[in-house]
């Protein structure tokens, strides 16, 4: 027998890799590219991996993905798409309070069970009023009541079929002349269950099902499009009223309290306090204010990168923490301010501390690939916030433009001079609203068209599931348990190892991800 072979069976297994505690015991700060996770044992298929994870103390998502509150990433279209696929979007606040509240309202109205506050018109309104409502809200199936309000007697309904072929000169036509009259409508009685109402809607083959009381007064409405959305998006993030979940960002100054009032009136589910450095007297005071005035509202504090920063916000009463400082692709905070922390270390250190108090953390920034998402979750993050990864998608705000034959969309940091010049909200985020000289902490750029997140996010979800499968974790909660117990093992990567782990040795190649 060769002298290098060991006889006696395979019971002996040498210790291999580092625990997370050992990995981050050194004084060096680590980013996601600085380490790998060692594989485990596979005894399940990737589709079985449960990605359910906590956003805050009281809000749980079926997909651990969040869109960042940036003005080139998240408005209503992005927030709707993210919620439909099990995540959530945070509407940016680099705009007027009224605009932001209206974007939240669009998300909350997008998909519902019983719609109790639909757009309602009267017979004396015109076709032009319907077209205006369609342009503003994106739908045209509008119930008609005697007074044009909920709780009034139902007299008909106007759908696109009633007005599609009317000429522009007919836009002044009264709805009483074009509406489908009450006698031809299929309705359901008040008190009907959502399941029963859905069955009636399916049998009737109508687009809308009005719900009326004993006096034939309109009390709610159900839309066929919502049935289709329920079928197509089983993971959708919804509140107790079956409305899509929506978050929004606010600042920490006195005038942000008015913005907060409008957002709560619009039905926002969770607030993120948007600051580049969250460990401040301003943010602590705002947390106290929100918890006193709106105790039901979930509040996410941040941004933080140390346990000491996290402690002050947890003591103030936050329900979640946003972790990251200077690690975003468009952020130059570390370069300009000399403050920040490598994101891998920041996520691990803050998550390890915050979990003792039941506070979930969001890994915000530095996410370039689906592998980075898996690493962030393996270090203790409950969810991952994405900016550049979602920028230049169809759902991101802004118009496409061409440069050198490439289709692009603008993407900028909220600390860029571009963003600061648009609104004072960006200046407040970086504590510079009173400065005579503005110090940029971000840049403006452009990103190549990525298409719709309807294709991109499913790719991310599948990638996370396959990553967990290779690790041997059936769920994200199991993944975190493996990390904290020491079962999950890591290994540092040299620069040569990073080169080896990427594409190399080819004359040319095409990198198609999905």
Curated annotation (Swiss-Prot):
Its main location: cytoplasm. Keywords: CBS domain, Cytoplasm, Disease variant, DNA-binding, GMP biosynthesis, Leber congenital amaurosis, Metal-binding, Methylation, NAD, Nucleus, Oxidoreductase, Phosphoprotein, Potassium, Purine biosynthesis, Repeat, Retinitis pigmentosa, RNA-binding. Changing residue 198 to K: In LCA11; does not alter the enzymatic affinity of the corresponding enzyme; alters the affinity and/or the specificity of single-stranded nucleic acid. Its cofactor is K(+). GO terms for biological process: 'de novo' XMP biosynthetic process; GMP biosynthetic process; GTP biosynthetic process; lymphocyte proliferation. InterPro entries: Aldolase_TIM (IPR013785), CBS_dom (IPR000644), IMP_DH (IPR005990), IMP_DH/GMP_Rdtase_CS (IPR015875), IMP_DH_GMPRt (IPR001093). It catalyses: IMP + NAD(+) + H2O = XMP + NADH + H(+). Catalyzes the conversion of inosine 5'-phosphate (IMP) to xanthosine 5'-phosphate (XMP), the first committed and rate-limiting step in the de novo synthesis of guanine nucleotides, and therefore plays an important role in the regulation of cell growth. Could also have a single-stranded nucleic acid-binding activity and could play a role in RNA and/or DNA metabolism. It may also have a role in the development of malignancy and the growth progression of some tumors. This is Inosine-5'-monophosphate dehydrogenase 1. It comes from Homo sapiens.
